[in-house]
UniProtKB/Swiss-Prot annotation:
Transmembrane segments: none annotated. InterPro entries: Galactose-bd-like_sf, PITH1-like, PITH_dom, PITH_dom_sf. It comes from the Eukaryota. Gene3D superfamilies: PITH domain (2.60.120.470). PROSITE patterns: PITH. GO terms for cellular component: cytoplasm; nucleus. This is PITH domain-containing protein CG6153. Belongs to the PITHD1 family. Residues 20-192 form the PITH domain.
Length: 211
C-alpha cells in the first residue's frame, strides 16, 4: 500500500524536525548511488540518456529541469543494474501534475535487458499509481520477493490519458550489499542515526562490516 511522507506542521517549532526528516529521507533514499548508471537502459525515451536523469538525490526530486519523456507512445521501460545486491523496501515515483503521470508500474527483478515483449510477462509485483508531483508517496514492495536484487526493471505501460508519459523522479529505498575480498559490507539506508551527522557525508556511520 502506498503512503505519504508529507506532514502538516502548525508552527516554526517544527522547522528543525522538518529539516532532520528531510536529511533522514535523503539518507534512506540513497540507493541511486548504487546504480550502475552507465548501463541503465530506458526504452522508448524521447532523447537518448534522458531516463538516467530521474535517478537523483531525494532533495532534488522536485527539480523539474531533469526528466524523461516517452517517445512513440506512453510506454517506458527501465532496465536498472546495480553494483551489488539490494533489498528493496520502498519506491517513490514522481511525475507531472497532469495526465502524463504514469498510472501503473510493473516491477521485475533480476531479468537484465528486458524488452517490451518481455514485459508482457507476469511481474514480480505491480502498483496502481497515484499522481504525485511532489514525490511524497511511497510504495512498499514485498521485502521477501525483493530481498536479493542485482537488476531491477520498471515497466510503465500507461498513464492517465496523455499520448506521452513524463517522469521526474524515481527513488529507491532499502539496503545494499557489496562483496569485498575481506568480507561483506552491508549499508543500511534505514539507519535512524542523527541525520545532522550525515549532512556532509551521507554514508558515514551507515555501513558495518561482517567478517
Amino acid at each position: 500500500m502506498p503512503h505519504g511522507h508529507s506532514h502538516d506542521h502548525g508552527g516554526c517549532s517544527h522547522e528543525a524536525s522538518d529539516v532532520d526528516h528531510a536529511l533522514e529521507m535523503g539518507i534512506e533514499y540513497s540507493l541511486y548511488t548504487k546504480i550502475d548508471l552507465d548501463n541503465v537502459e530506458c526504452l522508448n525515451e524521447e532523447t537518448d540518456g534522458q531516463g538516467k536523469s530521474v535517478f537523483k538525490p531525494y532533495e532534488k526530486r522536485q527539480d523539474l529541469s531533469k526528466y524523461v519523456e516517452s517517445d512513440a507512445d506512453e510506454e517506458l521501460l527501465f532496465n536498472i543494474p546495480f553494483t551489488g545486491n539490494i533489498k528493496l523496501k520502498g519506491i517513490i515515483i514522481s511525475g507531472a501534475n497532469d495526465d502524463s503521470h504514469p498510472n501503473m508500474v510493473k516491477i521485475f527483478k533480476n531479468r537484465p535487458r528486458m524488452t517490451f515483449d518481455d514485459a508482457r510477462a507476469k511481474p514480480d509485483q505491480e502498483f496502481q499509481l497515484t499522481r504525485d508531483a511532489r514525490g511524497e508517496i511511497e510504495y512498499s514492495p514485498k521485502v521477501v520477493t525483493f530481498s536479493s536484487v542485482h537488476h531491477l526493471s520498471l515497466y510503465f505501460p500507461s498513464n492517465f490519458g496523455e499520448d506521452i508519459t513524463r517522469i521526474y523522479y524515481i527513488g529507491l529505498r532499502g539496503e545494499f550489499t557489496e562483496a569485498h575480498y575481506h568480507g561483506v559490507t552491508i549499508c543500511n539506508y534505514e539507519s535512524r542515526a542523527n541525520a545532522a551527522d550525515h549532512k556532509e557525508k551521507a554514508f558515514d556511520g551507515v555501513g558495518r562490516a561482517i567478517q
